[in-house]
């Protein structure tokens, strides 16, 4: 039990908006309340968000105009001993990914309350893209804002080792040890699962946002067909906002397109399926809540692409299967149960309960000085 009463969490958006960072923040708030009796008050920083004044017993304030003054005023309503947890992703707080108002407001607040404790979870550092996109030209400003944030923050956390290294560099010596915590499942973590995949339905799940699932159908149908044949898949379950291009079959295997579903329904489906498929940049799997869900539910995670390096503790062939349609790679050496077990064990090292403990230690950091 903690004597810390309230955390002020700044987020871009919360449900009912579909927002991965908002889901992450809400799941973390639930766990902080469950494990440590810590209450969270949310400040929604996206002025276009539409939602209620509270969610699941957590109160919500909203920045109705992207103004540093308004942010300072809202933060000043709370006792300066209440730590602030910023969930940072530039595009969440400004259209072009450069929330100058947010950084300016936090700087002013820190000037007024120098002993206050600011912990920043960097979900992103800066965007990048081709030279004809605004992200390319604005990435310098985005990095400058991120650097300012690292210097304002008492502690920093992020989801990738690469990001942790960047934070160490741009903070110019302030943060020499930055925790990196791969994201947790936004669909919860099951209390019990069948001990063996053979006890589950021969079902494969394709889950996530429209863009990620559309990429599977646009680029990976041959691989998916190969997977279905090799694993004797009887049904593919497509979960999420309809893509508009989802086929009815992959080979002879029917696709059941069930649309958006509540978390408890998705949880039931994952717990009784054998595999989860994605076509994701393998260097960024630690940031994928979908990959996290596949691992948490002890499915066989399958990704259309693999990385030759071990990144964030994730190794192709050990923690996920990368099918090779040019050869039968389900010989004697292939054990899907072992890969499922390895991915599950990797996930448990940073599951939601463990992460909440780390966040609490950082949020309490100011009280320990």
Task: Cite the ranges covered by each PLM segment.
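Nucleotide-sugar donor phosphate/pyrophosphate-binding loop at the beta->alpha transition
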Residues: 119, 127-148, 187-189
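A charged, aromatic-enriched C-terminal amphipathic alpha-helix characteristic of glycosyltransferases
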Residues: 327-368
